[in-house]
From Swiss-Prot:
NCBIfam families given in the database record: IPP_isom_2
InterPro entries named among the record's database cross-references: Aldolase_TIM, FMN-dep_DH, IPdP_isomerase
Cofactor list: FMN; NADPH; Mg(2+)
Residues noted as binding FMN in the record, renumbered to the chain: A68, M69, T70, S98, N127, K188, S213, T218, A286, G287
Binding site for substrate: R9, K10, Q157
Protein localization: Cytoplasm
Alphabetized Pfam families for the sequence: FMN_dh
GO biological process terms on file: isoprenoid biosynthetic process
GO cellular component: cytoplasm
Protein name according to UniProt: Isopentenyl-diphosphate delta-isomerase
Catalytic reactions on record: isopentenyl diphosphate = dimethylallyl diphosphate
Amino acid sequence: MMESRHAQRKNEHLSLAAKYYDQVHQHHYFDQVRLIHDSLPEMTTDDVDLHVQLADNLEIECPFYIEAMTGGSDQALKINRQLAQLAHKHHLAMATGSLSIISKDPQSFSSFEIIREENPDGIIFANLSANASLDQAINAISLLKANALELHINAAQELIMPEGDRDFNWLDNIQYLVSELEVPVIVKEVGFGMSKTTIAKLQTHDVHLINVSGRGGTNFAAIENRRNHDINFESLLDWGQTTPESLLEAHSIRRGKTEIIASGGITSPLDVIKAGVLGARAVGVAGYFLNILQNEGYEALDQTLGEWQVIVKRLLALLGCSSFTVLSRVEYVLGTDLLSYARQRHLR
């Protein structure tokens, strides 16, 4: 059976993400963050607890998780099955790709349903556009028995996408969904980062979980520009804030109950730790894990996930931190570019 136009678009996203992987990872922005070593951590690895409480009713067993990637096609089904199996094995939370497609192509749901089938007791974040209706949100959460809902905000991607949305009046709808849903709502960028202004707007609309998702990983500007054969948006290929810049933006404002999640350009356990030092409560990883799965195979990603869990725990012990949530007390210095950004933005 021929796949729908929406499914074909999902396959294009996967193909182009792989095509541009090496290009977008030429710059490793977390290199601009150096942690200060303390020779006396006074800690054992047994003292370290990797659990993280993101909300009253949302706890994850490990501070990094498998971030939203794909869904809606046969190829996506295969990927999601493997990712869900590994999430189950390693007790990792996992976010789905955007479920918005299922309202237009109901047959595509099987590529998402497989995630819960392979990981019946795990933590799963459903994912929808920020303009989703309450019925769509309730349906997505119910179908997957999701523990949380990610609402992605992706204005830059949509504007470059030839068939993308052009209406970005999202805040009131986000606030409404937060107030009506029984599961925590995470508002997430898609690789363009967030400013303190954006974060403050979300706070005033009752959002308490924010994924700043900065530039440095999967580049949807490049992906959608490649798909757009009418208008060239090449000037926007480096649009937005990097993940470290976005974390500094978040750190500069009074957060209250708001918890920050980081994603975008995370390629090592040390990046996970650095994100925590800069204020992230948890860290999502998508492109790096997908690249291993597609190019090296299931067993290689299985080994990588296990190694990351061991290394993150040992790095916490090295820094004298009994949990991920106390990393913000670790001292650090910034490289020239990131320090200049922080000073010009009055972030430190």
